Regions:
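Secretory targeting and sorting signals
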Residues: 2-27
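Predominantly extracellular/luminal regions of secreted and cell-surface proteins
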Residues: 31-108, 123-152, 379, 385, ...
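Surface-exposed intrinsically disordered loops and tails
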Residues: 119-122, 144-146, 158-167, 246-258, ...
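Metzincin-family zinc-dependent endopeptidase catalytic domain
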Residues: 374-380, 384-388, 423-562, 571
Length: 624
């Protein structure tokens, strides 16, 4: 059974670590919850999802507010399929071709697609559920997914005992979604064609933990939320009025709202994405290395990209553009955002799905950031083993500030090593990073202009602060950094437009005594192990993982049969390359690389991600 394991060590474990001579009595900053999408997390994972979602909403608003419009008028294209009908462009093979779009000479790299999604006639409609359903234990049972793939119902905010006609604490309608044998994502959307109601959607687990919330869809007072329903468990969706105090103080107890806000009727649709709703597909011609971004607004809530062979290579029902590099030009905002790097020339399709009514989709294409540099400039990845001062605000955590991180050598005793072993460990880390990035991407990627320079603090002067230099700090601890993680990157930057970013690989959990964490390297060491090569390879793989984020790759599925550098945390044995014997540093160990693999299903994306070529095209020799 797949385990839903991404998260972080509890503060009690993390802050009690005594690693490499660091005492728990030493002053340490308050520990922050990182965004799991940016981090490589320990296997013993507990995430403060309420904190994660608060942080995401804050960063999302800041990203959209700060996004400057790029110059140039977009090409516009309206779908040819008649409004309210299906069948004309519903698959990648029947996509409508948009000529004139692209990054080549005489092409327009900006495109606006408009169209209309017809309703799904197969969604069953059920009568409104009876009050009182104002708390999780009283949630109305929708039967999704057991009832089928979707359900449509209606309700009223203000019709129960807690509305303006009751005690005035505010009406909250809860709906139960029942998990099956496997986890799934459900898309929940409100529609308020009449009345004054401005809806708020929120999702909770069975214990009342807030999992997410959404206020207004672009251009309306309606709401849409993607909800994860774990296998064998239930999730709960709440419909309420938007505004200050919209969430109840205790979702387990009815009547715990703060005030009455807007009231009125609403329609509610809950769908798993497996129905027969309309989808519209449009084809565009891309060149190898083109960085494609798409953002859907209006009534469309999913955007999907297919390659020339018809494979889904990126599907998204969410906006995570706030994780892009600060200066990334890629489209942001809207209901769903996707990004993709074309590994070869060809005709690709952009699909619009999951909704009913008018939509517009912004599609833009760029060449990789480093390709715009002067000849013959190349990007540098600097591996810093000497310790560093890092302002953790760049990782989007709160609280944040300047943090001093200890060097690699401080953690050597945790593996039973001494200062005399430091050079050998560094040799193996550097060799692994170079094999994963310099060698494999040059040998196996499609970028004939691939070029990158990997430097390190032992053998080279520190170039950090110079143009075109990103760094990975290998050292420090949770207590020192204030971030509960093993690894974290500054951004997920398709096209590598940031070019001067920072990632961390913390070493305290990795050097815990055997058995205290499955993410400790000591757990896999025995007298039969080639200890230093194994330690160097494991740290090198995590270092390459964080560099992979900064160069544009998202997490891949860590629990399938294929071990990949971009696998999410939770299966450290795979990331470390431990072979079938369960022992690190033996002959059956596995060479873990960047490669094609399934995007991590627990992060809400779908499709096959080619992390090898996403990373290869991020490091392109300057062409200007």
């Amino acid at each position: 059974m797949r385990k839903h394991l991404f998260g972080v060590l509890s503060a009690g474990v993390a802050l009690s670590l005594v690693v490499g001579g660091q005492s728990a009595a030493e002053p340490s900053p308050q520990v922050s919850q990182p965004d799991p999408m940016l981090a490589f997390l320990p296997a013993e994972a507990q995430v403060d999802w309420a904190a994660v979602h608060r942080n995401r909403e804050s960063r999302k608003q800041s990203r959209v507010a700060g996004k400057a419009k790029t110059a140039g008028q977009p090409l516009t294209y309206s779908e040819k399929e008649a409004a309210g009908t299906q069948g004309g462009n519903d698959t990648p093979t029947s996509a409508e071709h948009v000529a004139g779009f692209g990054t080549g000479r005489g092409k327009n790299p900006k495109l606006t697609l408009t169209g209309d999604l017809a309703s799904d006639p197969t969604i069953p409609v059920v009568p409104p559920f009876a009050e009182v359903n104002d708390a999780i234990p009283l949630g109305s049972d929708t039967g999704v997914p057991a009832r089928g793939k979707a359900v449509r119902t209606s309700g009223t905010i203000g019709d129960g005992p807690y509305g303006s006609a009751g005690d005035g604490s505010g009406d909250h309608d809860f709906y139960k979604l029942t998990g099956g044998t496997t986890g799934l994502f459900a898309t929940v959307e409100t529609n308020t064609p009449t009345g004054d109601l401005d809806t708020l959607l929120a999702a909770y687990d069975e214990t009342g933990q807030l999992m997410g919330q959404h206020d207004n869809l672009s251009g309306s007072t309606d709401s849409r939320l993607q909800v994860y329903v774990p296998p064998g468990a239930n999730s709960y969706v709440m419909v309420a009025a938007s505004g200050p105090g919209g969430l109840p103080s205790d979702p387990m107890t009815p009547g715990t709202g703060k005030r009455v806000l807007t009231e009125g009727p609403y329609d509610l649709t809950i769908a798993t994405g497996d129905g027969q709703g309309d989808s519209d597909h449009f084809s565009v011609d891309l060149k190898a290395g083109d960085v494609l971004g798409a953002s859907a607004a209006g009534k469309a809530t999913r955007v999907v990209i297919h390659d020339p062979a018809g494979r889904e290579v990126f599907g998204s029902s969410q906006d995570f553009s706030f994780l892009y590099a600060e200066n990334s030009p890629m489209p942001a905002g809207g209901n769903a955002v996707a990004d993709f790097v074309a590994p070869k020339d060809g005709r690709y399709t952009v699909g619009v799905e999951n909704g009913e009514g008018r939509y517009d989709v912004t599609v833009e294409a760029y060449r990789p950031g480093s390709e715009l540099n002067q000849r013959p400039e190349v990007l540098t990845i600097f591996l810093d083993f000497n310790g560093a001062r890092v302002n953790t605000r760049i990782f989007g955590v709160d609280p944040a500030g300047n943090r001093d991180l200890s060097p690699l050598r401080k953690f050597l005793p945790g593996w039973g090593l001494t200062d005399a072993d430091e050079n050998a460990v560094i040799d193996n880390v550097v060799a692994t990073v170079r094999e994963n990035i310099e060698h494999d991407l040059a040998a196996n990627g499609t970028n004939r202009r691939f070029a990158v320079r990997v430097l390190n603090s032992r053998d080279h002067a520190d170039p950090w602060g110079q143009p075109n230099v990103s760094r990975v700090v290998v050292g420090g601890s949770i207590a020192e950094s204030g971030i509960q993680t093993v690894g974290i990157a500054q951004s997920i930057d398709a096209g590598n437009f940031g070019k001067e970013e920072t990632a961390l690989v913390l070493l305290d959990v990795l050097s815990l005594p055997a058995g205290q964490s499955r993410t400790s390297l000591n757990t896999y060491l025995t007298p039969a192990s080639a200890k230093i090569p194994f330690i160097g390879r494991a740290i090198g793989n995590i270092t390459a993982h964080e560099a992979g984020h900064m160069s544009g790759s998202w997490h891949q599925d860590q629990f399938n049969a294929l071990d990949s550098i971009m696998d999410q945390g939770g299966n450290p044995k795979g990331m470390f390359g431990v072979g079938p014997d369960g022992i690190g540093g033996t002959a059956d160990d596995i060479d873990v690389d960047f490669q094609e693999d399934v995007l991590n299903p627990n992060e809400g994306f779908s499709g096959i991600e080619d992390s090898l070529n996403r990373t290869a095209w991020a490091y392109t020799r300057g062409a200007n």
